Amino acid sequence: MKEKSKNAAKTRREKENGEFYELAKLLPLPSAITSQLDKASIIRLTTSYLKMRAVFPEGLGDAWGQPSRAGPLDGVAKELGSHLLQTLDGFVFVVASDGKIMYISETASVHLGLSQVELTGNSIYEYIHPSDHDEMTAVLTAHQPLHHHLLQEYEIERSFFLRMKCVLAKRNAGLTCSGYKVIHCSGYLKIRQYMLDMSLYDSCYQIVGLVAVGQSLPPSAITEIKLYSNMFMFRASLDLKLIFLDSRVTEVTGYEPQDLIEKTLYHHVHGCDVFHLRYAHHLLLVKGQVTTKYYRLLSKRGGWVWVQSYATVVHNSRSSRPHCIVSVNYVLTEIEYKELQLSLEQVSTAKSQDSWRTALSTSQETRKLVKPKNTKMKTKLRTNPYPPQQYSSFQMDKLECGQLGNWRASPPASAAAPPELQPHSESSDLLYTPSYSLPFSYHYGHFPLDSHVFSSKKPMLPAKFGQPQGSPCEVARFFLSTLPASGECQWHYANPLVPSSSSPAKNPPEPPANTARHSLVPSYEAPAAAVRRFGEDTAPPSFPSCGHYREEPALGPAKAARQAARDGARLALARAAPECCAPPTPEAPGAPAQLPFVLLNYHRVLARRGPLGGAAPAASGLACAPGGPEAATGALRLRHPSPAATSPPGAPLPHYLGASVIITNGR
């Protein structure tokens, strides 16, 4: 009896095992796997397979499974599913409404280290981070649709991020945190709708399952991502303030890296996409990795480009705390709507570009208009009456910012001087003809000059001085320029020296002090007279120290003889002075006075703060002075300064910007 019962139990178990074996062979799995399954695994896999048939009752469908007649591509069609899985950098999974995994591809083992058999039929909640359980529940829940669908089945798109358990070795796992790996899941929630008999518009729905593709971020097989022409990367702080940008950002957006550093990414994103970026930023801080949706990144001059970013939080190796964010960005399109400005930076950039184009076009038009006059000016160039000047490096930079060598007043800094209006010489070694004016003005004042720099450069000469060629004034200038220098005292004069006009009879009005203050006035340097300083009072009454002159102490016999010869030559030149040096005719009150030719000396001015002695003259110059009987004969007068002519100790230093304007701002 006992033997019969033992034999019966053995036979039953054998039949049961046989049935399980037959059932395992029906599973869509390789025989090498099914032969090693236990009974529980076979039941679990079978129930999951049956649920999958309910979700996809037609399987692969007529297009793949059963062709009408044999063909050369039959083998490829049968293996199409496996080929797609190998091509896809991820794994496919189907989850029921209760969280049970109905299907997952064998490629999950590449990303998670978990086998297909182990995952299929088990709850997905066992393999995701506890903090992501609520999110997974929300993904599997479908709210009542707002409108009734006429279709029996419809789908709701889903895209989310899960931290799934990863048991791979550290060298193959990629980026993991506490044994979990961020997986980007994208797919749809399949819903089946049933119509009720009670009402035509009443219906109920059933959640069939979630079909999704999981991809690891970044791809686990790539440790160093190669950046192509449509890609750039940036490093930012945890609040998305940019710290470093790849130089490729210039090619795709127009921004230089230094334009975006220390600025937040939110300021350069389309306003309609800020919410999506904020949500991705939140997920990034919570889960450590994220792939953003497609968003619009504003370009520099207008419009935007579509971008998708793969961002990762980098942790400190010592403290294991979040340190910064590294993002690899894929630019998907060219710049769209280039004429549309959506930010203040785009507007300012467009305005600056338009102003530059306008200035360039204006300069080109002026060049065309002045070209005939320029040709005429070339034929009237005269030789330089001065010896080659020597400039310092700072003075050279200052000379390049104005109309150099021109006897007219320099234009304001805001007005661009056309290069054609500036005199030039074809034989000059150095042309001081800038094609544009700087957008800022220099600070005016006294600058030390080094006479040993740029000794080989030749300054340009103006084409017209306002008097005929070879006039006595020109000879006088040449004579004065050859006077020897003594000590550290030098002659300085500011451009313009003589105001030029279309005719010698017309006298230009004296420029006001406020306009001359902002003009780019170059300064020249000439040898100083070591014996006497002559000048004309060109300063307002408020500056008595600049209006009177005195005779210097007695000289030695040899120097006195040379000085007497020079005085005789000056008197001879003064008697033959032309119109520009003759005494001016009396004019009506209020009429603008003609600017005299003045050589200003800063010896006295610099003596207050510099190393020069206090006995130097205050200010001296040579002028064809009007008024008095001595002026009628062309003789020069020497004036002695009064006691009131000395400046008080706290008086501001005068700054000479022209022949008739003195600026008192002591900068």
Swiss-Prot record:
Residues 1-53 form the bHLH domain. It comes from the Eukaryota. InterPro entries: bHLH_dom (IPR011598), HLH_DNA-bd_sf (IPR036638), PAC (IPR001610), PAS (IPR000014), PAS-like_dom_sf (IPR035965), PAS_fold (IPR013767), PAS_fold_3 (IPR013655), SIM_C (IPR010578). The keyword Aminoacyl-tRNA synthetase does not apply. Residues 356-389, 409-428, 500-520 are annotated as: Disordered. Residues 369-381 have a biased composition (Basic residues). A motif (Nuclear localization signal) lies at residues 367-386. One of its GO terms (molecular function) is DNA-binding transcription factor activity, RNA polymerase II-specific. Changing K373 to A/G: Reduced nuclear translocation. Residues 409-419 have a biased composition (Low complexity). Changing M377A: No effect on nuclear translocation. Residues 77-149, 218-288 form the PAS domain. Residues 336-667 form the Single-minded C-terminal domain. Changing K368A: No effect on nuclear translocation. It is found in: Nucleus. Efficient DNA binding requires dimerization with another bHLH protein. Heterodimer of SIM2 and ARNT. This is Single-minded homolog 2.
